[in-house]
């Protein structure tokens, strides 16, 4: 016996063993089956042999005899339903593993015995499902002769299959599912025959077609009255759905015969006319299953190729009328699915059919019905996007010469169709035609040239003739933009030149093309900018001096020049000719402009950055999905470009460094980003040389500063800080040999009196530690760095504290375990910083403190006490631990100043919250007892910190530790319950509320001092009141409260500074909110206008009832306030949302909002000066479309307005808050 057969029979044994184990099951049906199996196996135990086939036969005979006992032989009615179900279930299992010869020879006898289990009235779903399984195994075992009935059987296999097909339409879901699985399995296992098609395939397909066609016929014959009966309609729809599921199951086997394809398509398209969406969806699933199966069969064997084409041809032949909206949309969806599936498996053959699809869709695009021509346009867009594979669009030698010519011919045919589309015949759907053209350019890319040039010329004439085609301007510009991306700006400029210098009717000006070139250019030739656009810059700049200074013409010229410069970054995005066009001459020209033209620095720096960045990112891509770009511009070209740019980087960096030093600090982050990009591609030798040059400049700057020239020339310290910025930027790319110079620089600048220099000194350590090699270097010089950090503590500038604390945290993380004395020497400074006025310093101090605690808690740590000032040199080393760290901090509790004591308590609060689980409870309680004493201090600063610490303990420490401390804590806290300064009363009240919640009201009441009972009573009443309101509050208020986020950045902040106001039921805030909602909930308002008084008898009255007070508006009130492009108010005060403008593609580009030369001209006219009264020049005040003008007396008017604002209501006038200061994106 072979291995597969052994595994097959072992699988049967496993299933029988599982049934045997259910003999004690609580489910009666499982238990009965197990008992039957056990009884049968005991009966045949004496007949068991080594021949497994004979054992299977014994099982079949036994179970068949039991089935005979359960069925009445004369009436064929079932006498014992349970015995019949168990026997049939076991037969279903055994038949699956039985020899096919046996089932084939006994087919008629077995089928006759199993038939009553399906046809009897008493047959339930489990019995029918088991009988279907038996019938499935029987039918799979039959050969072609049996199916064709050459044996002259009384009951043929087709009769059994028909029974299963009828059950596949049964109303019972589980029976139907089992029958569908059986049909699927039978068709997937055809008998051996000359053809791969199952003998019964035509029979099954005919049954499916007739069944669905009959139901649809019944549906069409129903009267309107019957259709209105919901039950009748639902029953028919359910029957359609069951038939569709059967068809899908059959089609998915790949056995649907070719002769039945046309009737199937016809009937499925009939279903798509239904108004029920789920039926339409199910019919599409049938189509999709058919397409998918045929395509897979075509790939595997090639047998279904003609069948698939026949299906597509049938669908095209069944095209509906171009006025039938519903059917047309459904039919088009089937076309899309068929073409996309075909293209997945046969890309070239699918591409050959696309011109035919365009020809067919002409009929529907010519339709005057919007739904029809919109559906047709979406069809063509989808087919272009999904059915044209990029691999076919490659040039030779990547594709065969014959394929290349074939594809070229197909593209040419499609392009000719577009020329017809752009004719007057399709003028009603021009917008849709232009969208299809955009999809064509996006798909064919470089292959669009030269086939689509005629279409482009037609669209260009539309754009030039702006008056006639104004409503299509956006779509036209999308087409031209797509053509720029596809064929490159050089081809577009050749066909549609700018003509900016001397426009005329024969040579129309195309200033509107500049924003399109800016937005759509990519992977173009940099030479196009140099040869086509740059000459216009010089031409227009030469005209600046020839026109009046404040004239509109000058503003138009400046706008054009700005637009031309805005295209440079896009030409620098992975250019095709970088090595040929980015010459020394061009680079030096850009460099001189960086020095001379301040307003161009952003654009030129962005262009230089993109030039390097695009090549680096492209070269680092392991695999690109854009096969067309890969062929046109291989990755090796990008690598050559990087090597070429690296030879220019030294000079470019020198220019950028100089420009950086000349630019104000709040407006030069973009220069640093460009510098960073070129540092990345600079060779190690050049980088080291550049670094040495900067170090030399830094040394000179520092020498001049120290020699006293700083008093004469205030910019020198600024220069030092600027050079340090550059050095910090270079750290990431420096070789290890330069690290010693960095450490020297750090030690020289860390004690500088200038805060900017000091901050950058500390950032050297922080930046260096981010690198793996840098961390190693810091660890190597850790002793020297520690000494420098400790010695420089006295000279720290206030604004440099945060940078210093970050450096300390970095050093602590890198400390060796025998250098923990550094923590002891710097912890006092960190603790004091927890009370710093600067928020960033405070947050960094807390992070550093926690980092120190974790370092001290590491095993095998050693504190060398003799190295700490004040300790005897013979003092032995001390092992580190978190407990030892807490003891070290305790020295701060007896500090000389109140500020030190307060800071130490705050530090303890942070550390207890973080390390409460690692710390010994005895030490925790000692610290608590000590700090609790400070609640009796006369210093409010100390008490405030102590209250915060006790709150952390109350919330975080175990209940058994805190319960004994509560009585004494209450006495000390209540000393401050009458103190309003510094919110002491509120803080004490919140802690008591927390205590009540944690230890219970009774326990707190028992330990509460008698003289302060009023406070406790107040808290109790408030809690009870809030509980009652919680029960009454609406769901809406609960949702609002639930969605409110936490105001705190960390759990520690919430514990220390949070209160019941944020998350307790007993909060005053929630009480106010709930109370306010409840009080105002009953208020309602009637909205009416003077013209239309409210009719209380009208059915629409409820629409005029509002829960908020309506605003009254008149036509002239706040007119400017509502003059907005996005919003407006109607006569009743309701907000009306207009169309929002599309977001700009380039936020940083100030010219991105200018979409065309005409717009730029109008903008210049609007914002230009006009002559007012007394011949004074007036300018518009705001940048929008306001009609207000200002003149020389504006300042006086503003002062009068301000005085009126200040004096109004006898209140002090407050200026509006200014916006946030500019923050550099590049952090140093």
From Swiss-Prot:
Main location: cytoplasm
Compartments (UniProt record): Cytoplasm; Nucleus, Nucleolus
A matching Pfam family: RRP12_HEAT
Disordered: annotated span: 1168-1228
GO cellular component: 90S preribosome; cytoplasm; nucleolus; nucleus; preribosome, small subunit precursor; ribosome
Top-rank taxon, per record: Eukaryota
Record's keyword terms, sorted: Cytoplasm, Nucleus, Phosphoprotein, Ribosome biogenesis, RNA-binding
Record's keyword annotation contains RNA-binding: yes
Annotated GO MF terms: mRNA binding; RNA binding
UniProt biased composition (Basic residues): 1212-1228
Quaternary structure (record): Interacts with GSP1.
Recorded family membership: Belongs to the RRP12 family.
Protein function: In association with GSP1, required for nuclear export of both pre-40S and pre-60S ribosomal subunits. Required for the late maturation of the 18S and 5.8S rRNA of the pre-40S ribosomes and for maturation of the 25S and 5.8S rRNA of the pre-60S ribosomes.
Miscellaneous field: Present with 8170 molecules/cell in log phase SD medium.
Protein name (Swiss-Prot/TrEMBL): Ribosomal RNA-processing protein 12
Source lineage: Eukaryota, Fungi, Dikarya, Ascomycota, Saccharomycotina
